[in-house]
Design a protein with these regions (language model features):
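Periplasmic/extracellular, small/polar-rich flexible segments of pilin-like filament-forming proteins
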Residues: 62-149
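Alpha-helix exit/C-cap motif
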Residues: 40-44, 51-73
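Internal alpha-helical transmembrane segments of multi-pass membrane proteins, especially GPCRs
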Residues: 9, 14-18, 39
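N-terminal leader/signal peptides at the extreme start of proteins
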Residues: 1-11
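Alpha-helical hydrophobic helix detector
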Residues: 16-33
Length: 149
């Protein structure tokens, strides 16, 4: 005869609720960090696209001896005709619109404007000039060019 009671091994409701709370706290901490990393990777892609557009502008200058005529608006500004108009350059989702502005025969300014899911990026609009000056416009308080470029 056995006087031992059968022990059952299982989770109690309280233990399960503690696990759910811990997972919720971890997710609450991790998700904003994840979003920041995703935005940063899209920003890196936009910087690469701006540099690609800069190379296309130089190629256009080599062929035409002017920067004029590289855009869709009056041939000088707006979306580029010498390169892709958005970043990423492939796919259907657009995170940055590329534009050309302030074009003369010897200078230009390029911009990557965040759109869609990237519209709330703390760096705002990334700009690049024909002399290689990198800048940001409409950035959040305390954000510097060094943080974004």
């Amino acid at each position: 005869m056995s006087f031992y009671k059968n022990k059952q091994f299982a989770f109690t409701l309280i233990e399960l609720m503690i696990i759910v709370v811990i997972i919720s706290l971890l997710a609450g901490i991790a998700y904003p960090s994840y979003q920041e990393i995703v935005m940063k990777s899209r920003r890196v892609d936009a910087k690469g696209a701006l540099i690609g557009l800069e190379n296309a502008m130089e190629r256009h200058f080599t062929e035409s001896n002017t920067y004029l005529g590289a855009g869709t608006v009056g041939g000088n500004t707006g979306a580029p005709t010498v390169f892709f108009a958005s970043s990423p350059t492939q796919g259907s989702v657009v995170y940055y619109q590329l534009t050309i502005s302030a074009v003369t025969a010897t200078s230009y300014s390029l911009a990557a404007t965040p759109t869609g899911l990237q519209a709330n990026d703390k760096c705002g609009i990334l700009t690049l000039t024909s002399v290689g000056v990198k800048d940001i416009v409409d950035e959040a308080n305390g954000v510097t060019v060094g943080n974004c470029w």
